[in-house]
Amino acid sequence: MAEFTPITIAYGDGIGPEIMDAVLYILRQAEARISLETIEVGEKLYKKHYTSGISEESWNVIQRTGIILKAPITTPQSGGYKSLNVTIRKTLQLFANIRPAVSFHPFTRTLHPNLNLTIIRENEEDLYSGIEYRQTHNMYESLKLISHTGCKKIIRYAFEYAVKNNRKKVTCLSKDNIMKFSDGIFHRVFNEIAKEYPQIDNEHYIIDIGTAKLATTPEIFDIIVTSNLYGDIISDVAAEISGSVGLAGSANIGQHYAMFEAVHGSAPDIAGKGIANPSGLLNAAIMMLVHIGQGDIASLIENAWKKTIEDGVHTFDIYSEHSSSKKVCTKEFAEEVIKRLGQLPMTLPKASYPLIVKKQESKIEYKIDTTEVKKLVGTDIFINIHVFSAHDIADKINKLDIGNFELKTISSKGLKLWPHDLRFEIISDHWCCRFMNKDGTEIKHLDIIILLQALSKANIDFIKVENLFEFDGVACYSLAQGE
């Protein structure tokens, strides 16, 4: 008797239940060797005051199966609710998000008939973590956290993926011309790891020009690896220019768990109308089948789906009088795919996946390197005070007894405003005061506490402390513009 793989099914919100029903119908008719356990997540849970959108019972099911097929969910835009997608990815340590973008020309509309690329997006870090604060009446903050180990994991995965899938080139996208540390470490790790794969071409673009090239000449790309937020944006660009965002599926891969989902959202504006395209979730299910070693079923379904597309049987989002023969609803599309099980596409590439998945050989060192000498050399203290001139702040602080510290600069939003020959007047209630040790010796935490006490006695409202470090004698903090 064939062994059945347990799968967690999440129907999601909006069009989620409709497209999930269609996909499961196809999986059953194709005799996929899976057993299903259903969980309730998303909007219904938010309304029950689960701020994460998921219950403990659902976590237990996911932990038991290890594999999730998830339809899109709706995250309330009001405050206090966290994205379920991000929560699942981070909790299960699904560090790699794989998003293929392929043209199905001439059967779907596209300006890029030769498009065939895969975006590999870091999935746990970056601004997308959603770590945010309101610090003053006027100022809000989002934290961009990038780790050395996180960069190594995703970039190593991208090159291993290229090798296993016979890809020729890996392109890195970052913004390290501006963000020297966070995006800088991503680019540096890319350069280091690329040297270990001489058979794979490598290149780097700044994210803005890279995105422009993706939108206009996507044919030049093969594999793109990038950080979380950039990857989220460019994968939608790639999916849209391929013909429709409704066609794209994605995989979220970790060491112990995996989640498969469509790229698109829950589309509540068309929910319940029966017109949604299930192809994105179906392609995600195909990726899932390959992942669990059922390449035969994955090939069977993908070939039937491609034959359906070739035959011009299209849902509303990709229907065209020039390339379509029949406009169908969600359920009808599933039935048309099922009719073609066992058939092969005539023009589009035929799918042929192995029965046994080749696990990626991990060469990643997860240990944090602590050999660099770390030295505390200063501190940035952010204060909330509503004045028009940094000179007024400097005059007040310089009258205080702040021990062995000296006030070096005052800036706002990264622009140095003191000391300066010109007295800039700006509207701000958020200032960064940089303090350094007068004699250059190492600072102790107690010194900073004494400094904060002096500010507190002067009724200066400090809202954040960011310590300044050298690693092996190299200053590892940014300078303000003009510093």
From Swiss-Prot:
It catalyses: D-threo-isocitrate + NADP(+) = 2-oxoglutarate + CO2 + NADPH. Keywords: Glyoxylate bypass, Magnesium, Manganese, Metal-binding, NADP, Oxidoreductase, Tricarboxylic acid cycle. Mg(2+) binds at D232. Disulfide bonds: none annotated. One of its GO terms (biological process) is isocitrate metabolic process. Gene3D superfamilies: 3.30.70.1570, Isopropylmalate Dehydrogenase. Pfam families: Iso_dh (PF00180), Isocitrate_DH_C_bact (PF18324). NCBIfam families: ICDH_alpha, PRK09222.1. NADP(+) binds at T74, H264, G265, S266, A267, P268, D269, I270, N277. Homodimer. Its EC number is 1.1.1.42. PROSITE patterns: IDH_IMDH (PS00470). It comes from Rickettsia typhi (strain ATCC VR-144 / Wilmington). GO terms for molecular function: isocitrate dehydrogenase (NAD+) activity; isocitrate dehydrogenase (NADP+) activity; magnesium ion binding; NAD binding. This is Isocitrate dehydrogenase [NADP]. Binds 1 Mg(2+) or Mn(2+) ion per subunit. D-threo-isocitrate binds at S83, N85, R89, R99, R121. Belongs to the isocitrate and isopropylmalate dehydrogenases family. Catalyzes the oxidative decarboxylation of isocitrate to 2-oxoglutarate and carbon dioxide with the concomitant reduction of NADP(+). Its cofactor is Mg(2+); Mn(2+). It comes from the Bacteria. The lineage of its organism: Bacteria, Pseudomonadati, Pseudomonadota, Alphaproteobacteria, Rickettsiales. InterPro entries: IsoCit/isopropylmalate_DH_CS (IPR019818), Isocitrate_DH_bac-typ (IPR014273), Isocitrate_DH_TT1725_C (IPR040978), Isocitrate_DH_TT1725_C_sf (IPR046997), IsoPropMal-DH-like_dom (IPR024084). The record marks Y128, K175 as: Critical for catalysis.
